[in-house]
Every structure is written in structure tokens, then in C-alpha cells.
Amino acid sequence: MPKVQILNQQGENVGELELNEAIFGVDVNEHVVYEVVKNQLANKRQGTQSAKTRSEVRGGGRKPWRQKGTGRARQGSIRSPQWRGGGVVFAPKPRDYSYAVPKKVRRLAIKSVLTEKVNDNEMIVLDKLNLDAISTKKAVEVLKNIKADKKALVVIDKNDDTLYRSFRNIENVAICEAKLINVYDCLKYNSLVITTDAVKILEEVFQ
């Protein structure tokens, strides 16, 4: 079973935690991770891009000049794609880019990135994470004490308004509940800072 050190908010080693091998010790499947990240990014797309085809642009119903005799190239409409102000060829229209990925695939991807974080020593486990009051300064101090990377994802066990409002203002730092963890965020941030209670929730959810 993989083991990690447990730190307190001052960065001191206070114990060791045995991680569930079924979640933090799987064979990393890079292709599954790629597919899930691609799915997440596709689902985020607004899909509101829109442009007009030549049939939708106002005007252009009259032939601009006669077919022959002018010396100029023949034209049928001033709204043809080659004209300034003309329509767009195969103009994009609003569409839904989202699609579903099987639950088993999503779970395998999460397990793969969590395993990778443990293997690369990028997962920092805290015994607890508490702040007496909303303070970005103290939040920065905690991250500095535990030597987290400048790009860090903080994972807590439950919604805590004090922690959310303290960490959300730090550049390149995100905070989320364990049950809302996702593959893209795990890869986007170099350090994964997680509490022991949040680890238990992950082991319950993804077991």
C-alpha cells in the first residue's frame, strides 16, 4: 500500500497515512485520462458561435452587373463569400458540444491521476485545515509552510466558507470539496493539497 507523510499547517511531520491501493496505486492509463480531459473541455464549451451564410445575409438579390461585356469577372450576388460583407462558407451555428463518458472510465481516470500525484510526490496530506477567520494572508502562509507549488489544488472534506473565501483569491490556487474533484483540475495544478478527512471521502466515493 502506498504511504504518505501527514503534515500539520506549520509544515511539521505528524504521522503517516496508508492509502487505499485501489485508488492511489492503480496502473496509470494515460489514454483514459486524455479521453476524460477532452470530454471535460468539450462539455465546458458554450457552443454559441454563429455566422451567416450567403442566403442569410441581407441584400444581394440583384445581379451586380450583367454577365458579359464588362470585362470584369462574372458575379451573381454581392453577398457571395468572396465579397466584403458577404456570407460565410459553411457558417458555424450554435450547437451542443457536450457528450457523455461512461462512469467507469471517469473513475479510472481519477484513480490514474491520483496515483500519478502520489508517485510524483505531488500530493501533500494535511491532518486538518482550519482558519479562525477569512484571511488570504494566512492561507498563503499555510501553502508556504507545507512547500506547496505555486499552482495548487486544495481539496477539503466539506464546504467551508472561511476556507473558500481565504483561498479563492490566491493566483493559480483553487479549492474544492473531495466529492467534486475532477481529472482536469488535478492535472492543471502541480500540487494536490488534501486533508486526511478528504482522503477518506475519496476512498469511500471511488472504492
Swiss-Prot record:
Family membership: Belongs to the universal ribosomal protein uL4 family.
HAMAP family from the UniProt entry: Ribosomal_uL4_B
Presence of keyword Transit peptide: no
Name the record gives this protein: Large ribosomal subunit protein uL4
A GO BP entry: translation
Gene Ontology MF terms in the entry: rRNA binding; structural constituent of ribosome
Compositional bias (Basic residues): 60-71
Gene3D superfamilies from the UniProt entry: 3.40.1370.10
Taxonomic superkingdom: Bacteria
Keywords for the protein's UniProt record, in alphabetical order: Ribonucleoprotein, Ribosomal protein, RNA-binding, rRNA-binding
The species this protein was found in: Finegoldia magna (strain ATCC 29328 / DSM 20472 / WAL 2508)
Gene: rplD
UniProt entry tagged with the keyword Zinc: no
Subunit field text: Part of the 50S ribosomal subunit.
Region of interest (Disordered), ranges: 44-81
InterPro entries from the UniProt entry: Ribosomal_uL4 (IPR002136), Ribosomal_uL4-like (IPR013005), Ribosomal_uL4_dom_sf (IPR023574)
Role, per record: One of the primary rRNA binding proteins, this protein initially binds near the 5'-end of the 23S rRNA. It is important during the early stages of 50S assembly. It makes multiple contacts with different domains of the 23S rRNA in the assembled 50S subunit and ribosome.
